[in-house]
């Protein structure tokens, strides 16, 4: 079957989804979560095939971490689906309701987007998360994962499609593209009369390919070059906690820290404490000359290091003379994802927040909170770095649009 035929079937199924009640969608998502539990053994076996193949190819540690499903991680995926199931249904929400002077009643109402193409790499959890969010919001979803996770994605999709069938919902509402040739992805991205939105999640190469070739609207989930700026007034212990959590808790995540900026007035107090805490977590440090004056044992950082999304236990460090220099550095090297300031000066915190265009800005909180679940959205479909209708972590509302519904009693415009 051609990709166009698959997309047409998904569009037809999306029409069925859009008519389901909130209760029906909740029951469907709970059944999908249960299906993951029922098929857990097969899913984990399929994932092991992908992990073994990736190891044989010499895949890096960061990619392997994103690819790997453990029983605990798979259980967490199911738990995320259950959380989405009980979230308020955005479809049908009235966001504006007023009566015009001529008597017509004007409402703005949330409706599903339609068909969403999710294009991603080695994150099998995205298969379930994206399906759950799209279906909860009444959308059909076309999933095109990476070849690294093909067995995992197929096993997860089959389990979820089984739940759709049992609920008498066309399984095409969740369509997994198994033809992973780039030509097929290119054809999918050209289907502007069928696909309403494409969301790429993955490496820079994938996102650039989608953005450059798509004829459908694209919301990019670009790389996360995330910074922590430690201001002169920062509480050292607090800042060290933010740094260790942001860098070492899960370095392969896009909301992990990649660069540390330290105000010169606090560098001699903060850097030794930070280095000791990071070394205990096996983090490699690279710094500029001012950093190495305090930490002479670390390697020198290059311009490429400051622009890098390491997704690994590596951190670039720079000492800056003031807040303005820190902001200029972030504007030059950042990716509009997530930025953090540690400070006890409210005015500096406000300047930091107002001066950056990043999707998420944190004050005295870990970058790892830049996540749909942590911000109260339930499972997220990704973190948008595109300034369109959604910016930052994308939950259910971001997968709907508002339209006008107008009710009258025969009014005409003269």
From Swiss-Prot:
GO function terms (MF aspect): glutamate-5-semialdehyde dehydrogenase activity; NADP binding
Alphabetical UniProt keywords: Amino-acid biosynthesis, Cytoplasm, NADP, Oxidoreductase, Proline biosynthesis
GO cellular component term, pick one = cytoplasm
Q: Which GO terms describe its biological process?
A: L-proline biosynthetic process
Reaction(s) catalysed (UniProt annotation) = L-glutamate 5-semialdehyde + phosphate + NADP(+) = L-glutamyl 5-phosphate + NADPH + H(+)
- EC code(s) of this entry: 1.2.1.41
Transmembrane regions: none
User: Signal peptide: which range, if any?
Assistant: none
Q: Which InterPro entries match?
A: Ald_DH/histidinol_DH (IPR016161), Ald_DH_C (IPR016163), Ald_DH_N (IPR016162), Aldehyde_DH_dom (IPR015590), G-glutamylP_reductase_CS (IPR020593), Glu-5-SA_DH (IPR012134), GPR_dom (IPR000965)
Q: In which pathway does it act?
A: Amino-acid biosynthesis; L-proline biosynthesis; L-glutamate 5-semialdehyde from L-glutamate: step 2/2
One Pfam family recorded for the sequence: Aldedh
Where in the cell is the protein located?
Answer: Cytoplasm
For this chain, the family text in UniProt reads:
Belongs to the gamma-glutamyl phosphate reductase family.
State what this protein does.
Catalyzes the NADPH-dependent reduction of L-glutamate 5-phosphate into L-glutamate 5-semialdehyde and phosphate. The product spontaneously undergoes cyclization to form 1-pyrroline-5-carboxylate.
The protein's name is Gamma-glutamyl phosphate reductase
> What does the record give as the organism's lineage?
Bacteria, Pseudomonadati, Pseudomonadota, Gammaproteobacteria, Lysobacterales
From the UniProt record, report the name of the gene that encodes this protein.
proA
């Amino acid at each position: 079957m051609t990709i166009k035929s698959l997309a047409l079937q998904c569009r037809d199924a999306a029409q069925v989804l859009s008519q389901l009640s909130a209760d029906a969608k909740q029951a469907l998502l709970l059944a999908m979560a249960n299906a993951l539990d029922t098929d857990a053994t097969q899913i984990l076996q399929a994932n092991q095939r992908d992990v073994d193949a990736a190891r044989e190819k010499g895949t890096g540690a960061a990619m392997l971490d994103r690819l790997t499903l453990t029983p605990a991680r798979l259980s967490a995926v199911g738990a995320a689906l259950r959380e989405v199931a009980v979230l308020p249904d955005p479809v049908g929400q009235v966001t504006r309701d007023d009566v015009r002077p001529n008597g017509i009643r004007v409402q703005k109402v949330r409706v599903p987007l339609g068909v969403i193409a999710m294009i991603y790499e080695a994150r099998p959890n995205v298969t379930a998360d994206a399906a759950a969010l799209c279906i909860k919001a009444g959308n059909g979803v076309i999933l095109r994962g990476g070849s690294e996770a093909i067995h995992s994605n197929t096993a997860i999709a089959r389990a979820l499609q089984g739940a759709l069938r049992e609920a008498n919902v066309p399984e095409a509402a969740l369509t997994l593209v198994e033809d992973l040739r780039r030509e097929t992805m290119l054809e999918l991205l050209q289907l502007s009369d069928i696909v309403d939105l494409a969301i790429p999640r993955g490496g820079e190469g994938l996102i650039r390919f989608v953005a450059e070739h798509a004829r459908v609207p694209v919301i990019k989930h670009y790389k996360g070059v995330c910074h922590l700026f430690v201001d002169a007034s920062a509480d050292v212990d607090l800042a060290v906690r933010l740094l260790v959590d942001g860098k070492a808790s899960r370095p392969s995540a896009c909301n992990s820290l990649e660069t540390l900026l330290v105000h010169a007035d606090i560098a001699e107090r903060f850097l030794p404490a930070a280095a000791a805490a990071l070394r205990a977590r096996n983090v490699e440090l690279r710094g500029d000359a001012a950093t190495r004056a305090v930490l002479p044992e670390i390697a020198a950082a290059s311009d490429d290091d400051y622009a890098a999304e390491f997704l690994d236990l590596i951190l670039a460090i720079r000492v800056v003379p003031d807040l303005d220099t820190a902001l200029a550095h972030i504007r030059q090297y950042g990716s509009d994802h997530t930025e953090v300031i540690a400070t006890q000066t409210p005015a500096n915190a406000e300047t930091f927040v107002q001066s950056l265009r990043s999707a998420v800005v944190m004050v005295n909180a870990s970058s790892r909170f830049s996540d749909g679940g942590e911000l109260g959205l339930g499972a997220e479909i990704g973190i948008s770095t595109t300034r369109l209708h959604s910016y930052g972590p994308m939950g259910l509302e971001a997968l709907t649009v508002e339209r006008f519904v107008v009710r009258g009693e025969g009014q005409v415009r003269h």
